[in-house]
């Protein structure tokens, strides 16, 4: 399930950025915007599903000491998903959106950093840190 989660995040971030820049210079969405946005929503559902699955698996074992970090990552992940959607909708409506865009990017970086340092992440595996 971890691979599905990582794959979904990578595709979701790419789709978010492509959807964000798929507007004309006048601010109207291009024809490709709607399919991109719908595909992004599909991947957001996959992200949420696989993330919740991982949290349930981790909490079911109850052997790790990283529950607080995992909960923080879960909250950040839900925030990223919400900010992605709100940013695109506000841009489509012509409202202010640049601050939301950069806030989303910053929260993506924080969430990815938390995912990297948690057990099962690349740094934990590199230094053989177990739960």
UniProtKB/Swiss-Prot annotation:
Q: Which organism is it from?
A: Staphylococcus carnosus (strain TM300)
The membrane spanning regions, by residue number, are: 1-21, 42-62, 69-89, 99-119
**Which keywords has UniProt assigned to this entry?**
Cell membrane, Membrane, Transmembrane, Transmembrane helix
Quote the subcellular location field of this record.
Answer: Cell membrane
GO CC terms for this protein? plasma membrane
Cited InterPro entries: UPF0344 (IPR010899)
Membrane topology designation = Multi-pass membrane protein
Family statement: Belongs to the UPF0344 family.
Chief location category: membrane
**Designated name of the protein:** UPF0344 protein Sca_0577
Do you know which Pfam families this protein is assigned to?
DUF1516
